[in-house]
Amino acid sequence: MRYILDIKMEIVQEILDQLYRKVLLGTTLEDDVHGYIFYLNPDLSEQDGCPAFPVAQSNASGVLDGMAGQHGPSSHEVATLPGAQECPKRQLQMDRTREMKLLQLTVIDTMLSQVLSDETETHAKEGYRELTEVLLQSVELDSKLMRMLQNSDKLLSHMAAKCLASLLYFQLREKVRSQHKMLSNSWVTFCQKHLSESSESGEAVRCLWILTAVIKEILKDTHSQRAESLKQLLTPFDITFEVFYNSLFSQHFGDFQSPSNLASSLMCFLELLELLVASRIHLKLHFRSQRMLFLKPHALDILAWPIPAFIKRKLVILVKKCLLCKVGEDLCREPAPSLMSPDHLLDSDMLTLADTLLHAVHVGLWKALAVSGKPSCFGGDEVQPGCRLRTGPDHVTLRAASLITVKSLEIKSQNCTSAAEMKVALQTFMSELLAFLKPHLQPSLQPHNPCEWLSRVFIEQDDDMLEAAKASLSIYLQLTREWDASASLTQEKEAWIRSTHGHGCNPHCVFLFFLKNVAFDSTVLLDFLISSETCFLEYFVKYLKLLQKDWAHFLSICKFFAAVESQCGMLVHDPVPSPARGRSTSLTVPHAPASPVGENTCPWLPWASDASSESQSQVMMPKETLPVPANGPPSRTPQSLVDYDSSEASEEETTSEHLANSKQTSLCQERSEEIQGLPRTWEEQKEHSLEPLLSAESSSPFSAKGRVAADGTVWQVGLFLRTVKCLEELQGAIYRLQEKNLFPYNPAALLKLLKGVEAKCVNV
């Protein structure tokens, strides 16, 4: 009998294997699909852990002779093998049972994928759909998969969850298509029960995983009824999600019984929260569960829990995506639809989240966040034997925490009622951020120019750097508009400008540090402009508008940068004890000296009002500086994506190729290291003199040929001329691409702004 039993198992496995191959290729099922129900029933091999198949000898011989017999046994052929429950080789047969179950689940999951695929041939798809519906009706496939979720075998449990997710998505699609099919009631009840009872049970984690998988499939789909499908899924779970959210995040860490189950629950639920927010933005649904993270942001409390760092990192990144409205970009195949009218509800929720986050920062959120230097190790914190432990902070978390602070401050500033309130918010929260960053940035930030923090923190991530720069610029513009509304507040405006510098938000400093990071390479700016991302374009346009209005301030900043590099030498980049520690928020910055300063001091920023008595043509620069070629050492010269000076090369380039090669992060890092590594010391610059930055006889306002040193080098002509030369080259490159119809959009407005800056240079 045992020999016959082994034969029957081989028969079933061979039939399943053939069915799997057919389904994998999308082949039409030639035989009656009902014949396969017997072999796809998950209960087929279950009888006290041992196989006990109803089989017939005639059917077995038919299958072994080339599968000529029928796929399922007839009722008169069924015979139960005696003694099957007493299995001497129990472990071997249990292993075979497990393998057959896995094969069954693989066939079912593949079949559901073919049903949902647009590439499957119509006739074959109908056969797979019919077989799936019969499985649901005759053997209650969904209920049996739910029982398998609780199997101690992790692989079986995972495959059952995977099949159940595909089955639920199939039901949602079919319900929308036929308008009468229902989502599995047993599944809804199962989920509601376990999500309401415990926030750290294994069943709750599996429910979260399945729901997440279904929502991902909905977001990735391209059919026009995605919103309706998601609505059908979320409706029975809207209240359940909120109950689970409160249960998970309202407790103290010590109240949880299993740290490992808690970590799994947190990871799964954070991913579900991200998808809920993404569906709100991309599908324009408005469920209460989609607003939980905004209305009840006490999820931030887990940043102080003793949980693995990768969970905290995931939460911080999720908040960052929410504030930037970039949730779900990696799933949805099309960008978020532009709103025909402002979404005031979303704006209100954003403000709530920003206010809560800033309040948490004020009471010490970042002080409690440990930014260790241990690598993530694919989501874990343990370093494997033989792997070298990297030193330094977790830059991913550091960047995300910095960006959400600045972005929250931007949102708050847009809703402040007065300039004084904005100023207090800036001083309070930027002080907290700079204090958080200070121990993690080596070498330390320059004490005389905290604005360097932005380029230092985001040097490896240009997208986040541009978002932070744009938010910082928006804060500055918002407050300056308030000051400009009253002409009697000149002194207060000057104090505000000093405050932006002291708290790392001066837009001119930020822009100049950005240019230094990219080595004043105009092709890097051009690559950003022709990228599919619009963040740099938005930032650049706003800054060019500000530059024309705030020209005197910009010249003063350039003078400050040049004087610091001349007088302090390498002190600009070396750690220096900060005199700003412990100072009051009403910072008073000394005036820049008109003559060389002492050997151990650094000049401070001269403000626009201080420079008003001087002629703008007399902005001073050091005459003797280290001779470095204009574009740096030849071996380190940045390589442009396109040779814009070659007409043939430009004509051969297509716009899509430009867009595909838009990122220059590694170039930015390389050039920044080159600039910071220049051997400029005090001894080399002790003997120096000053001369005008620009002369009236300069051949072109957008030219770097004015007032170079006697040795003919260009580096020492000053930050101002390097900036002007970069903008000149950018303007020329845009013109050339526009003439050849290679620029991806109409750059007329951008060129007009660049011409406006050129006109400012004429008057210098």
UniProtKB/Swiss-Prot annotation:
Q: Does the record carry Phosphoprotein as a key word?
A: yes
Q: Where is this region: Disordered?
A: 615-668, 682-702
Q: Which domain of life is it from?
A: Eukaryota
Q: Which UniProt keywords apply?
A: Phosphoprotein
Q: Where is the composition biased (Acidic residues)?
A: 645-654
Instruction: Give the sites modified to Phosphoserine.
Output: S650
Compositionally biased region (Polar residues): 658-668
Its Gene Ontology biological processes?
A: cognition
Composition bias, kind Low complexity: at what positions? 691-702
Give the family per the record: Belongs to the protein lines family.
* Stated name of the protein: Protein Lines homolog 1
The organism encoding this protein is Mus musculus (Mouse)
